[in-house]
Amino acid sequence: MNIHSSTNLPAVLTSGKLPVVAAPLFIISVPDLVIAQCKAGVIGSFPALNAREKEGEPIELERWLKRITEELDRHNQENPDNPAAPFAVNQIVHRSNPRLMRDIEICVKWNVPVWITSLGARPEVNEAAHSCGGIVLHDIINNTFARKAIEKGADGLIAVAAGAGGHAGPQSPFALIQEIREWFKGPLLLSGSIATGRALLASLMMGADTVSYTHLTLPTICSV
């Protein structure tokens, strides 16, 4: 049975065991956690800016992507019947991010499969993701920003509704999903107070394809 609302959902979003993207959390989301999430069958993610750097040392983001990519590749070779889900990198697209263009080049180099963009929709970022076969999911808090993101080349949307962490929006998930689904038939994720199987199922019934949450993965040894 096809539980997804989109008619053209990318394979990268359907390859996991559950329709879940583990949200990229400031400081908390690190390679150990991302790898564990992917091996468990959900898309793990981290903000690029979590890979903090020290002067004179190798570029930390490159080290993180190398480790995640190689470890997931090794897992998939050893477990062909139980492959890991893909991973995602969150890029803060706001022009106050001095690392953005360099970090984009590194993500292209490592063929990051899923890009989560926040705080600004820029066509050149979407084009970079597409150049390496990636897809772009853009954080939005209302229908106006949703339209702008798609117009500028994003592949899908993450509806950040009331109750979500980070840059949360004020709208009810019921209203936000309904507004977007009136015109958008592509990949649509929902974020906001989703922490149980019942909430996941309700999100899918409302019209979301996937949900974004992380709280249930935090009390794990890999995130300590």
Label each residue range with its predicted role.
Residues 157, 207-212:
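Active-site-proximal beta-strands of protease catalytic cores
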Residues 37, 202-203, 211-214:
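Hydrophobic alpha-helical segments that mediate membrane insertion or helix-helix packing
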Residues 144-152, 195-209:
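Catalytic cores of alpha/beta
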Residues 2-189:
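Active-site entrance/lid segments in N-terminal catalytic domains of soluble metabolic enzymes
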